[in-house]
Amino acid sequence: MAALRYAGLDDTDSEDELPPGWEERTTKDGWVYYANHTEEKTQWEHPKTGKRKRVAGDLPYGWEQGTDENGQVFFVDHINKRTTYLDPRLAFTVDDNPTKPTTRQRYDGSTTALEILQGRDFTGKVVVVTGANSGIGFETAKSFALHGAHVILACRNMARASEAVSRILEEWHKAKVEAVTLDLALLRSVQHFAEAFKAKNVPLHVLVCNAATFALPWSLTKDGLETTFQVNHLGHFYLVQLLQDVLCRSAPARVIVVSSESHRFTDINDSLGKLDFSRLSPTKNDYWAMLAYNRSKLCNVLFSNELHRRLSPRGVTSNAVHPGNMMYSNIHRSWWVYTLLFTLARPFTKSMQQGAATTVYCAAAPELEGLGGMYFNNCCRCMPSPEAQSEETARTLWALSERLIQERLGSQSG
């Protein structure tokens, strides 16, 4: 069913499939009961498992509940213009067993972004996602757009960004989504994006720093910095600097920085424990693509932590996330070896919807309101590397980032 797919559900049997002749229904209060059409009777317990259940959360965005003349509950999907007696929340039922508390976390590595947003309405909220024309950035943007948010795709390639916008509008023609040019490898482009955004006179509730480059051959940007470092860290740092006044005025607001578990396999300090710029923006002779990526991801966590320390008193929180292991996306396309590696690993990886889940969780979870300075993997907080926890390194990186921008743009840095 299209409506169920939109709600983040599949029209497939669940693990506790009903026997032939049985139907699952819900009361208007959310309790699940089972109708046996063969014997014309109903019961609260599942006919196979014996469990009682109730649906979790509110109805998906765009749905409404009603009661017909016979007292039976029905559901209206205003987006797809259809009515059904099947509760769209039935895929998200929870056991009604208060005597057996569970410590299982609410979401995990198999959760999708749409499942996290199930029942949420983001009408009136503005979300910016960098690198949103494909991969987890696209799924992040789509998930928020399908739940009422005004979503801006900040992308370098406008042709692909326009295609991404069209794909979202195909799923829901009323989605409020647009694309704006942002090239993180060019500081002037970051500046122009910020100016274009501010000209819209809209708030900014969620900023997702998602864009990244991986496995590039060594090159310098027009700003004279190694490309991986500028795209993955410095460009996002500058973007947040330029938009922080809007974020603060829109508080409570959230910044999500997409990092990676690979941040654990490197350091950016020298043997004396001091931040080493040559490790961040190395020469061609000292460059190794994987190491450059790992270092940029360490910068992401350090930046997110320091940003939270600075802006949380003004109502802006920041968290860093790891989206998932070896997900198949365009990030690997720069070298055939990585393409082969990602292809071989594909059967064991997350889907893009699952990869976007941790980002969306940190951007939307009510239980994280006002909380930040943390690192998440599989929708669960975990400790980053000891290097990523260094407040001194984070402060030094912040000061260095400011200086690099000032040296290149001078008084026009904003």
From Swiss-Prot:
Keywords attached to this entry: Apoptosis, Cytoplasm, Golgi apparatus, Lysosome, Mitochondrion, NADP, Nucleus, Oxidoreductase, Phosphoprotein, Repeat, Tumor suppressor, Ubl conjugation, Wnt signaling pathway
Active site annotation, chain numbering: Y293
Annotated positions of the Phosphoserine modification: S14
Domain of life assignment: Eukaryota
Gene3D superfamilies referenced in this protein's UniProt entry, alphabetically: 2.20.70.10, NAD(P)-binding Rossmann-like Domain
Region feature (Mediates targeting to the mitochondria): 209-273
CDD domains tied to this protein: human_WWOX_like_SDR_c-like (cd09809), WW (cd00201)
Listed PROSITE patterns: WW_DOMAIN_1, WW_DOMAIN_2
Positions of region (Interaction with MAPT): 125-414
One Gene Ontology term of the molecular function aspect: oxidoreductase activity
Binding residue positions for substrate: S260
Residue ranges of domain WW in the record: 16-49, 57-90
Principal EC category: oxidoreductase
Positions of region (Disordered): 1-24
GO process annotations (BP): apoptotic process; negative regulation of Wnt signaling pathway; Wnt signaling pathway
Signal peptide residues on this chain, from the entry's feature table: none
InterPro entries per record: NAD(P)-bd_dom_sf, SDR_fam, WW_dom, WW_dom_sf, WWOX_SDR_c-like
Sequence positions bearing Phosphothreonine: T12
Gene Ontology CC: one annotated term: nucleus
Disulfide pattern: none
PANTHER family in UniProt: RETINOL DEHYDROGENASE, WW DOMAIN-CONTAINING OXIDOREDUCTASE
Domain notes: The WW 1 domain mediates interaction with TP53, TP73, TFAP2C, LITAF and WBP1.
Its job: Putative oxidoreductase. Acts as a tumor suppressor and plays a role in apoptosis. May function synergistically with p53/TP53 to control genotoxic stress-induced cell death. Plays a role in TGFB1 signaling and TGFB1-mediated cell death. May also play a role in tumor necrosis factor (TNF)-mediated cell death. Required for normal bone development. Inhibits Wnt signaling, probably by sequestering DVL2 in the cytoplasm.
Family stated for the protein in its record: Belongs to the short-chain dehydrogenases/reductases (SDR) family.
Protein name: WW domain-containing oxidoreductase
Organism of origin: Pongo abelii
